Amino acid sequence: MSEDLKQIAQETESLRKVAFFGIAVSTIATLTAIIAVPMLYNYMQHVQSSLQSEVEFCQHRSNGLWDEYKRFQGVSGVEGRIKRDAYHRSLGVSGASRKARRQSYGNDAAVGGFGGSSGGSCCSCGSGAAGPAGSPGQDGAPGNDGAPGAPGNPGQDASEDQTAGPDSFCFDCPAGPPGPSGAPGQKGPSGAPGAPGQSGGAALPGPPGPAGPPGPAGQPGSNGNAGAPGAPGQVVDVPGTPGPAGPPGSPGPAGAPGQPGQAGSSQPGGPGPQGDAGAPGAPGAPGQAGAPGQDGESGSEGACDHCPPPRTAPGY
């Protein structure tokens, strides 16, 4: 029995360790999913925004270089060969500049000999015609604030009879768009405790529960103190029915010879006490039927003279 209990305790301990390990892993995974995933998404969005800003800046600088190149080309009067328009379409060049470059593309054959003829012959570089214009790009980031302007001219002097009054500016400032929701604030302090509620009335006593099972037998108690002596008993003479005669006892041993008695008186003594009733004798033989006798006289009332005297204890 003890070995089974030890085995059960070991299995319980091992299961408890497994359950604790599983709960710990689940908690760590849940916290990682709640904290790490939003942080990773925010970081990726930040990287994407940064790359988008850098790409837009590169496109802006490229457009500026092309504008400088065109300006220099117009000033010098020399028109050189411009690269394919398909390459600049991926860099975000505007449709107007692409149109201008496509118009001057065929005229470059007289200078460099690299352009195709206007008669519809194939281009020497093996590139096809420019494709359709792409969709407009995303809006760029807002630029920096400009330099402060020059101070304004001084206002006119007020007249002598004019009194000073409060400034009356009249600006029509439309409401701006709502900003993004801020981070939730910290939990506020606990409020003051409320007033104590009304005390309930006196509850009514419930019904008596069912009788419980009988308890185990208690230990026997110690002996009590001795009681006071009872009142002396009273002898009640109740005539009892004579019991059956006992068996005759065995004869006792012969006694020692007694002392010689005194000379008796000439007068006989009185009758001794009546002895106990003897055993009933055996029934005699049935006699002959006698002649009916004469009616006797009425007998006297019955008495107890036929009963032996009661034997009482000494002192009664």
UniProtKB/Swiss-Prot annotation:
Known partners and oligomeric status: Collagen polypeptide chains are complexed within the cuticle by disulfide bonds and other types of covalent cross-links.
Biased composition (Pro residues): 205-217, 241-251, 307-316
Annotated region (Triple-helical region), positions in chain: 128-157, 176-202, 206-235, 240-266, 269-304
Organism of provenance: Caenorhabditis elegans
Official protein name in the record: Cuticle collagen 13
Low complexity composition bias: residue spans: 127-157, 183-204, 219-234, 256-266, 276-295
Residue segments, region Disordered: 127-316
Transmembrane segments: none
Signal peptide limits: 1-36
Keywords: Collagen, Cuticle, Disulfide bond, Repeat, Signal
MF GO annotations: structural constituent of cuticle
Family: Belongs to the cuticular collagen family.
Keyword set includes Signal: yes
